[in-house]
Amino acid sequence: MAPGESAQAAGLALGRRITEVFRQPFVLDTQHVVVSLSMGLVCYPEQADDPAMLLRHADTAMYAAKRAGRNQLCLFDRSLELAVQDSLRLDGALRQALSGQEFSLVYQPILLAEAGALIKVEALIRWHSPSLGWVSPDRFIPVAEESGLIVPLGRWVLQEACRQLAQWRQENPQSSGLRMSVNVAAWQLADADFVTDVQEALAANALLPETLELELTERTLIAEDPTIEQNLSTLRQQGVKVALDDFGTGFSSLSYLSRIPLDTLKMDRSFIAELESSRRCRDLVQHIIAMGRSLGLQLVAEGVETAEQAETLTRFGCHLLQGYHFSRPLPPAELAERYFQSRLPG
């Protein structure tokens, strides 16, 4: 509470100071810990004049801060109520969807730059709700992360992707060298059972660890959670591959290369989009590829939409290409029909 004539300004200033304090790591049982802080601010009496309404509006603003990426301060606005109501509807529908088999996976091919052969696929989740219709992942994934549903949802994606890979291999001898790439969220990686979840998904489908690649974003690594790093290290030692997605968009991209055990760098699609129009972007992409190759990492360019982009990336030495120039994400049967007629690398 910040009383006074300029309560809003005082509240914002105080909130920013508190947020900055919590951005700093602190020591807990000899471990450096970083916590995220989400704050909601509401002004009395302009926005509410009774305690119950003040708390409700502050709570609404706090959840808006969480949706903005955590470590945020948000001032209440009437429009936020609609967003919160939408999130609550989505949360309820998500819980029902998990038990109602409303989710499915599609798979986008990732190809060798020089030979054009299919090397691996990226599993992408889709949701068709009976009441909401098709819901974009950009809309429901943040809600799943806020509610904690991302852990069981991510577990289902992992299990289904491994099951599908095993089925392809059983039905199509040409797919024997195919690998599966699965996106994982920070909440999953920090879960105590995550390593077991991966091991069980592989064992249940008789898959070797090296057939699975886990994709994580730079945002996942910002908190420097020791559990995340330990889980990744354990799985990589067992043979599971690790890829850093959207490389180059974070503030500390280079630090991750020395801290996190990685096999693959996926360059952010924003670089690829400007490849032909920006000399600076071309130089940056060329340097990222050269750096990755010197570190023994596999380079993937996603968001490739033109033949010119593909040719430039191949000339620069990028190993793998992914994007609509080659294929949209496909249902399992369509992908098998299109790609398993030619031999995959073994």
Q: Model-derived features: where do they sit?
A:
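Active-site loop/short helix in cyclic nucleotide turnover domains
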Residues: 1-5, 144, 253, 275
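Bacterial c-di-GMP phosphodiesterase EAL domain
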Residues: 20, 78-82, 89-207, 219-220, ...
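EAL-family c-di-GMP phosphodiesterase catalytic domain
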Residues: 31, 113, 117, 130, ...
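Regular, well-ordered alpha-helical segments
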Residues: 20, 24, 60-63, 67, ...
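Residues at or immediately flanking beta-strands
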Residues: 25, 32-40, 72, 102-104, ...
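Heptad-repeat coiled-coil signal-transmission/dimerization helices
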Residues: 11, 15, 55, 195-198, ...
